[in-house]
């Protein structure tokens, strides 16, 4: 009987971390092909065709391209970036002084997953690197966990001075500006 209880106790101890991990990453976008820990191999391609115009201030573009997808720019698990289609001339992402705080050199893409360590959309950080979310994208990161979500940084091929921060749990991304380190 004692052996059976010991085995049961050990089984519970071994399964607890797996259950906690499942809970941490299981709160994604609610659809199996967005988020859930997926990390795209690369960022979005540059817009090559006639770009979609930036939405008018009163307009709200639709991003949930499938049932259950987030109403925010996101990436499918097949690598398709949804919502990055306005091109270089999108005035919402024009910076008077691109790279004002330098270039981010911490690493990009799949091999560089960063855990958010604190802050909010106006100033957040990880590993001594500081960032802020672009004003037009503030509504797209309201459900990010600023002290625990994993993100991946990609270079933005269309908007000079901006990067894209991709949230692996939710599968959503935002334009972010690098504010420097230290």
Language-model segments: what does each one mean?
Residues 1-93:
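Extracytoplasmic low-complexity, disordered linker/stalk tracts in cell-surface/secreted proteins
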Residues 60-182:
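Low-complexity segments
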